[in-house]
Amino acid sequence: GFALGDGFACIDLDHCMDASHRLLPWAKMILAPVEGKTYVEVSPSGDGLHIWGTCAERKGVRTRDLMNAEAYSQGRYMTVTMKPYGNAVDRLADITLIYDVIERLATP
């Protein structure tokens, strides 16, 4: 696993795939800005994704109403599966935009 902080962040999309392992529409929208630009892996559940990247440290956020998404950049330990998803690359991109979207939709 990996302890987030020092500029490293992770977006955790839970239950974002259908039975055929195709992304649900909301997950496609979240992934689109960084697809092919940052490392993305299948989460331990097998039907979720971890989008790894860089972002300034900020409060963790979660939304459950419109989508099952969480965003963390500090004080959180994330499991690393090393199961790349799609055209995942071996580098990290800035995921601040995705973090911002999840924060705006966050469940209070």
Where are these regions (language model features)?
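Signature for HUH/AEP ssDNA processing cores
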Residues: 1-46, 56, 85, 107-108
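Long, charge-rich alpha-helical interaction segments
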Residues: 99-108
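Helical (often loop-to-helix) elements that flank the catalytic cores of nucleotide-handling enzymes
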Residues: 20-34, 53-79, 86-95
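Residue-level detector of buried hydrophobic side-chain packing
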Residues: 11, 50-51, 80
